[in-house]
Design a protein with these regions (language model features):
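Structured alpha-helical
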Residues: 1-240
């Protein structure tokens, strides 16, 4: 109980710029690691910046030289190795800043069992870091089922440059293509790139003068034999 009272006293965000190692598995066979610094921290979560995209609901593994009085799950090891769920993501667009501001909630020393086979799954916690995780509904049905009152999907060809980055953040593949349909929330794009569900891509339209990051939700092949990827924008809405 005394420890719980101490946590309540320090639940406000503390501006500790500690180094942190972030590991993210986008798919079963692709992961990356980035070293950055915390902006602020509490016993239950932290804020920091990343050069790479992620999204709300994704799980990240963090290694932090965290003061023991701020820890909830481990008070023995020198390094605090903790799993966290992304609760907030905002792109930094004002020069010279770039990348993303990220806010996470710590969830424990081990990930959910489903993470092992499907690391791209997104999760949610209802009230606090001690609540059970629930898998967010990721159903993404391309075509007419995507058309809703709030996010109308327009059957229009928007030019897109699709870029895929490697573990070092360098562009390794790119393709100029068009959308089959698009909404403010996501799009279906024709592609010949062999890119897995769960990966993040960068898309740029000269027509709209817009660059956005997106997560691949599914892949399909149409009746015309042409592959499509169905993506959801993670850092902004598309200006239609």
């Amino acid at each position: 109980m005394a420890e719980e009272r101490n946590w309540k006293r320090i639940k406000e965000r503390l501006p500790l710029q500690l180094p942190v190692r972030i590991n993210c598995r986008e798919t079963s066979d692709f992961e990356w690691t980035e070293v950055t610094r915390l902006i602020n921290v509490t016993p239950f979560g932290a804020g920091f910046t990343l050069k790479r995209p992620t999204e709300r609901g994704r799980l990240l593994h963090m290694t932090i030289p965290m003061p023991r009085q701020l820890r909830v799950y481990d008070h023995v090891e020198d390094q605090y190795r903790i799993w966290a769920i992304v609760r907030y993501l905002r792109g930094r667009t004002t020069p010279p800043a770039s990348g993303f501001e990220v806010g996470v909630a710590f969830i424990g020393k081990r990930p959910p069992e489903s993470y092992k086979s499907q690391p791209w799954k997104r999760y949610e916690i209802s009230n606090g870091p001690f609540d059970k995780l629930a898998v967010l509904d990721e159903t993404w049905q391309p075509g007419p089922r995507d058309v809703t009152d709030s996010h109308t999907r327009h059957n229009m060809a928007v030019d897109m440059r699709v870029e895929l980055v490697d573990v070092n953040g360098a562009i390794v593949e790119s393709e100029q293509t068009v959308t089959e349909n698009i909404s403010v929330q996501g799009a279906s794009l024709f592609t010949t790139l062999d890119v897995s569900v769960g990966r993040f891509i960068r898309v740029t339209s000269e027509q709209y003068r817009v660059t956005a990051f997106a997560a691949i939700r599914s892949r399909t092949t149409g009746a015309d034999g042409v592959p499509r990827i169905h993506v959801e924008f993670v850092d902004r809405q598309w200006p239609l």
